[in-house]
Each structure stands twice: as structure tokens, then as C-alpha cells.
Amino acid sequence: MKITLLSTAYPYRGGIAVFTERLARAFQQEGDKVNISTFSLQYPNFLFPGKSQYASSERPSDLDITAEVNSINPFNWFRIGRKIKKQKPDILILKYWIPFMAPCLGTISRIVKRNKHTKVIVVVDNIIPHEKRFGDNFLSKYFVNSVDGFVAMSKSVYDDLILFDAKKCILGVHPLYDNF
């Protein structure tokens, strides 16, 4: 199968990047052709609460990672959407963890699905954020309506997801990491 992952990955650090890279390797071990499309800009610096968004480690040599998605530039979303649409992966796997990403990921998903071939599946860490903000439900609803299915990483997220769309969701409990 031809699989595109659109998620946080190197040069970014953190649990989502580790998960994405590990998932890509698992698909590769099964014989699938995998590429990762990650962010050229994930968050503007003033929105990032930590010390640094970036990894201090070496670039993974066994993964095809392209930093190209700008989370706040709609022109970029259309360009990336058209690019992935043209590549026609069998599956586009998105990672969703915060409604801030809904306009970007939802727009890209809608464009890709126009190729009538690619299925868009989302691995969800949170659909309703811990720190709720005005507009979160609207943004998440926009995103939910753009994809074919969800894998919730916990029972509580599954319960939140079925409030948006019970038909598209399965529970796949978060795996233990084997990279430590």
C-alpha cells in the first residue's frame, strides 16, 4: 500500500513526532511505501508554550520526511492538498490533537479526497481539548466532516468523538513505545 502520514515528525520533537515516526516504521516493516509530510511551521513561536519545538537529534535516515505544511497559511494548505491528491496514496493518515489544526488538516483532507481514491483516516489524541476555548467545537466539527474514519487512542477520546460522529470511529488504545 502507498501511505502518506501528515503529522508532526522530525525536525519536531515530542510524543506526537515519536508516534508518527514509529507508525511509519511499522508500515514499512509490513512492506508498505510510506512518506511523512510534516510541518514547516507547526505553531507560531508565540503560541508554543515550551522551550523549543525542535528535536536536537539527528534526522532519521530510514524515513522519507518532508517538512512542508504551514499550519497557518491557507495558500500552503491548497498546495499541499493538491500535491497529495495528485500522488494518490491509498491512505492518508492524519494525527489530530488540537482544534487549532482543524482548518489546515480539514482543508487538506477535503482536497485530497477529491481524487476519489485516497481514504483519510485520523489518529486522534484529543477531539475536545483539556483547555477549552471559544470555537473549539466548530473547528473540530469542520475537521470531523472532512475525513473517512477515526482511531481514538483512549476510551475517553472515543467517548468524545462519538458525540461528533459515532459511525466513523473505532477504539485503538495507545500502544506502548519500544524506542526507549
Predicted features by range, described:
Residues 74-80, 92-116:
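An aromatic- and histidine-rich active-site surface loop
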Residues 7-22, 97-102, 131:
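A short, glycine/small-residue-rich beta-strand->loop->alpha-helix junction that serves as a flexible
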Residues 88-90:
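Proline-aspartate-enriched helix->loop->beta-strand connector
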Residues 7-13, 25-86, 157, 162:
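N-terminal strand-loop element at the rim of the active site
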Residues 145-180:
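Donor nucleotide-sugar binding/catalytic pocket of nucleotide-sugar-dependent glycosyltransferases
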